[in-house]
């Protein structure tokens, strides 16, 4: 029997739980939220699609009773507040750090061997906090951001090439932010051939730019942050763990010398399986890409340093 807990029943969390159920990633999904009745309602709504969608996964909604999350193989953390008007970045980090730290303490109390997938923002910083505040081995804390950013890259590539998104491949490394992510065009292909054979440098640059502002574009259109792709991206990471897929997924991982970096969590290509991050792939990237990665590193370190300034770590 496999079990996944999703903490936070908002748009991203509920979408994630729905994708997990429809794809029958686990036998049981526990959706938990602090708001009375909210997770129960979302879970009931999902379960009422079971016959329509043909899945057998059981989704249970819970209000703030972490004992019901016991025995989870994977815990996906989506809880946290969005940045409100007038709120400084430091204030946002302080609030969300407190939420994430409290949640992690609770889930590990009942599922001490769970692998944690962090979605809460700022994602690289929250993954770093989770790892160091709890003293977990680095394979058990995974930041979801690269999976989402890479999905967006593939979407914009498919639009430029006028092809199916499943015919293109590519991924994004670096921080999960519109100025810190690095779409690796040198590893981007269409049916196994580098996309530079099909797109002009200008067209490829437009794909890169669209990817980097992908989240902001959706916020402008929707009036709020996106949730469909983020929820599905988190579910895809959980699926790779539960099904031991040994799948290459770009994720925010703790580095111990890879790419010349230590004491940081940042997006890099990882092999994801039953043990979480089973391997970090150190690719032969160009000097330009490496320089961009170190620029991203500096930005991520600056944000992560706020945790120590606030005495959270």
What are these regions (language model features)?
Residues 13-14:
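N-terminal Rossmann-fold NAD(P) dinucleotide-binding loop
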Residues 51-114:
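Rossmann-like NAD(P)-binding element
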Residues 34-72, 302-309:
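Conserved N-terminal Rossmann-fold NAD(P) cofactor-binding segment
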Residues 9-10:
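Glycine-rich Rossmann-fold phosphate-binding loop(s) that bind the pyrophosphate
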């Amino acid at each position: 029997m496999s079990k996944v807990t999703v903490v936070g029943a908002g748009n991203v969390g509920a979408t994630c739980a729905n994708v997990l159920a429809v794809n029958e990633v686990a036998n049981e999904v526990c959706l938990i939220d602090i708001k009375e009745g909210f997770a129960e309602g979302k879970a009931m709504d999902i379960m009422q699609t079971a016959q329509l969608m043909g899945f057998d996964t059981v989704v249970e909604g819970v209000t703030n009773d972490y004992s019901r999350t016991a025995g989870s193989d994977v815990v996906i953390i989506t809880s946290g507040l969005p940045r409100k008007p007038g709120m400084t970045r430091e204030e946002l980090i302080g609030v969300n750090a407190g939420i994430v730290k409290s949640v992690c303490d609770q889930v590990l109390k009942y599922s001490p061997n769970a692998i944690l997938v962090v979605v809460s923002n700022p994602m690289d910083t929250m993954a770093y906090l989770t790892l160091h505040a709890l003293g977990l081995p680095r394979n058990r804390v995974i930041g979801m951001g690269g999976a989402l950013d890479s999905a967006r890259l593939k979407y914009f590539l498919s639009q430029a090439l006028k092809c199916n998104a499943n015919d293109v491949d590519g991924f994004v490394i670096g921080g999960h932010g519109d100025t810190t992510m690095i779409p690796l065009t040198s590893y981007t292909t269409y049916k196994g051939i580098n996309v530079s054979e099909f797109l002009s440098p200008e067209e490829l640059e437009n794909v890169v730019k669209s990817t980097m502002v992908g989240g902001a574009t959706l916020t402008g259109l929707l009036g709020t942050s996106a949730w469909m792709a983020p929820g599905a991206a988190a579910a895809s990471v959980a699926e790779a763990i539960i099904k031991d897929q040994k799948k290459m997924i770009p994720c925010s991982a703790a580095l111990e010398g890879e790419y010349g970096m230590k004491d940081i969590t940042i997006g890099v290509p990882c092999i994801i399986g039953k043990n979480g991050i089973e391997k970090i792939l150190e690719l032969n990237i160009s000097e330009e890409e490496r320089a961009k990665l170190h620029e991203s590193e500096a930005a991520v370190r600056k944000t992560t340093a706020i945790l120590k300034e606030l005495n959270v770590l």
